C-alpha cells in the first residue's frame, strides 16, 4: 500500500463522536456505536483522500458497477465533494489490514421548504461479505442517520430492495405510501430529537401538517 505523509478527511471526524446511539430505535446486541464499533481494530470515520488504496472502490463494486476509476479521477471527485460540503461518505476500516470494509453515503439536499431546511439521502450502503454478522450494516446506517439529524435534516430518505425493507424498518424507517420501495425517517422540526415513525397511514388533505403532534406522520404532499 502507498505510504502517505498527509491525509485529508471528507468532513470533520469529530462530529461522529457527538452522535448519541441510545436515541436510535435500532437494537444492538451487544451495544456498539461509531465511537465503539465492537472491535478495537474497527474504526468508523469519514472517507479519506487516501482510501483509494484501502479498497474503497473495490468495496463499492460489491454493491454496483464502479468501472475502472483511476486515482486521478478518485481524487478529483473527492475534492469536488469536499468543496461542496454536502457529501458525508462514511466508512468502516479494518485497521489491521488497512482495508475499508463498510460504507454509506449521506447526501444533503438544500430546500426552500421547511424554512429553507435540508433533507438527507442515504445511498451506497455496503458491508464486505466476509464481515457480515457483526452488526456493521446496522452500525453504518444508524451512524449516517444520526449524522443527518445532527446536521439539521428534517428527514432522511432512501430506496431499497424488497428484501431489505424489514431491516430498515428496525432502524426507524417507514415505507412511503404509493412510492415503490422508497423509505423515510423524519426528525423533529427543529432537528433536536430522533423519532421513530410509528404509523404507516398517510395524512390526507391538501396541505402538510407540520405541527409537532403530527410531524412524524408522512403526507404524500410533503417532500
For each of these PLM feature ranges, what is it?
Residues 20-76, 194-202, 206-216, 222:
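Short amphipathic alpha-helix that is part of the acyltransferase structural core
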Residues 42, 97-103, 120:
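Glycine-rich phosphate/pyrophosphate-binding loop shared by adenosine-nucleotide-utilizing enzymes
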Residues 79-91, 121:
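A short helix-loop-beta-strand connector motif used in the catalytic cores of GNAT acetyltransferases and
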Residues 91, 99-108, 126:
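Conserved beta-strand in the GNAT
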Residues 99, 110-122, 132, 179:
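A conserved beta-turn-beta hairpin within the catalytic core of GNAT-like acetyltransferases
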Residues 108-111, 157-159, 163, 169, ...:
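Conserved catalytic-core motifs of GNAT/GCN5-like acyltransferases
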Residues 124-127, 133-146, 170:
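Conserved acetyl-CoA-binding loop-helix of GNAT-fold acetyltransferases
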Residues 141, 148-161:
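Conserved GNAT acetyl-CoA-binding A-motif
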